[in-house]
């Protein structure tokens, strides 16, 4: 892929990503696939599967950069992505109940918890309608509980 050979298009964000991530072992093809999950939001009918894959790639990249692996990290990324899209009223094409059930009771390693804390909040929001505003005591407690236990 061109990104792997330092042929980065003149897009500042892409150049910054390539400069930071390719030296850390992230492949250019992964960066290119990452954008697909985000560009689907620009269409009239966003593709739920593509949105979810964008989250899966984001979390797989995050886990790689944190130096940890977990079989459920991509599922966690899908849940996070779908809930963030719904929280911002960008799309309601998918309600992440499958992902929520798959992650129920799963415990993430300490090294991944700064990343998976976002999933704990997404799971909390998925169980409530409408989701609470950011910064409430209940959401803060969710972050603390996840940091201590690693459970979703």
What are the residue ranges of the model-derived segments?
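Catalytic cores of Mg2+-dependent Asp-rich isoprenoid enzymes
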Residues: 1-39, 47-152
């Amino acid at each position: 892929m061109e990104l792997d050979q330092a042929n980065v298009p003149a897009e500042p964000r892409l150049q910054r990503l390539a400069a930071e991530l390719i030296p850390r072992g992230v492949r250019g093809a992964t960066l290119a696939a990452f954008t697909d999950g985000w560009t689907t939001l620009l269409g009239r009918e966003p593709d739920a599967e593509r949105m979810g894959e964008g989250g899966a790639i984001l979390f797989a990249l995050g886990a790689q950069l944190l130096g940890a692996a977990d079989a459920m990290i991509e599922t966690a990324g899908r849940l996070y992505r779908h809930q963030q899209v719904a929280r911002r009223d960008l799309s309601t094409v998918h309600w992440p109940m499958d992902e929520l059930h798959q992650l129920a009771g799963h415990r993430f390693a300490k090294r991944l918890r700064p990343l998976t804390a976002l999933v704990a909040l997404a799971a909390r929001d998925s169980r409530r309608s409408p989701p609470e505003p950011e910064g409430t005591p209940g959401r803060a407690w969710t972050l603390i509980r996840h940091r201590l236990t690693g459970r979703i």
